[in-house]
């Protein structure tokens, strides 16, 4: 299937119908078959940027995730991996939840290997590869940022959290651009954190403190704050956009505080895919 698709991609100018594709592929890492979907928009060019989108806890390969529409307009590829089943039988990313203890799946390694595979076999950019994800996928973004990986140039967790164990046991080896989007009324991934593990997901940090770690790590010396009304005028939500910048390193940190927002991708409040792509594009290599 993959080889056939590659041939069709080369013949794309002959047929628009063949140019825009959603294909499924897989590779084996540490004995596990790792599946993924890949969206390649109409007219995509060789060495185009690549964005990974990670589903939430219990999720599946999501063809209608917030990045697809943006990718169709902007010409980048979107890879949507499938998490493996954890000890509770739920597809997920191994971020060290208490009930994942003893689970040997290394998703930092698996996603890095997958990115290298996709870059090579689908002729996509090695330099401009980025990572975003929702909830459990957002936690995976933070874990990747803390890890000694060189694959993902920037990360954008949505409703993501920094587990206390990450902050305690890991030391980020280098600055990395980070963009968090989070609702203040999120009762699944609490804005105020859960240091006592009352929710059963493990202890995790308050969102402003978790983001503040990266502000300090990236040595962002300037903050710009702007209040923006949400797209849905009926729900009363508004967004406080915190942008922390470092002109020397270029490793910015953004936090979109969705006031009144709950546990979601916030597509009713902002153009989530466009905002994330705007952040990633700002950090692309030439």
Pin down the residues of each PLM region.
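Sec-dependent N-terminal signal peptides
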Residues: 4-14
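Cap/lid segment of the alpha/beta-hydrolase catalytic domain
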Residues: 83-106
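Conserved acidic catalytic loop of the alpha/beta-hydrolase fold
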Residues: 109-127
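Short, proline-enriched alpha-helix->beta-strand connector loops that line the catalytic pocket
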Residues: 173-178, 249-253
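Short beta-strand/loop motif that positions the catalytic acidic residue
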Residues: 180-182
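Accessory cap/linker subdomain of secreted extracellular hydrolases
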Residues: 184-225
């Amino acid at each position: 299937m993959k080889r056939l698709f590659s041939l069709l991609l080369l013949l794309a100018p002959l047929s628009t119908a063949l140019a825009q594709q959603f294909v499924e592929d897989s590779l084996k890492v540490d004995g596990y078959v790792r599946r993924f979907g890949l969206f390649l928009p109409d007219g995509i060019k060789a060495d185009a940027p690549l964005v990974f989108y990670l589903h939430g806890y219990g999720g599946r390969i999501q063809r209608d995730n917030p990045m697809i529409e943006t990718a169709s307009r902007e010409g980048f590829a979107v890879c949507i991996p499938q998490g493996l089943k954890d000890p509770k039988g739920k597809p997920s990313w191994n971020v060290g939840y208490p009930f994942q203890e003893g689970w040997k799946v290394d998703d930092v390694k698996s996603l890095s290997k997958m990115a290298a595979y996709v870059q090579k076999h689908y002729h996509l950019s090695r330099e401009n590869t980025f990572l975003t994800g929702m909830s459990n996928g957002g936690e995976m973004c933070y874990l990747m940022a803390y890890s000694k990986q060189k694959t993902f140039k920037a990360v954008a967790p949505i409703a993501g959290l920094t587990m206390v164990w990450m902050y305690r046991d890991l030391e980020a080896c280098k600055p990395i651009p980070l963009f968090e989007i989070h609702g203040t009324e999120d009762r699944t991934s609490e804005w105020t954190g859960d240091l006592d593990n009352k929710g059963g997901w493990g202890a995790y940090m308050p969102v402003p403190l978790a983001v503040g770690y990266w502000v300090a790590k990236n040595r962002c010396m300037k903050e710009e704050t702007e209040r923006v009304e949400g797209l849905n005028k009926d729900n009363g939500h508004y967004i406080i956009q915190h942008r922390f910048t470092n002109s020397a390193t270029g490793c910015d940190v953004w936090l979109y505080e969705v006031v009144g927002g709950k546990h979601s991708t916030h597509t009713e409040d902002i153009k989530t895919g466009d905002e994330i792509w705007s952040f990633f594009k700002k950090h692309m290599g030439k």
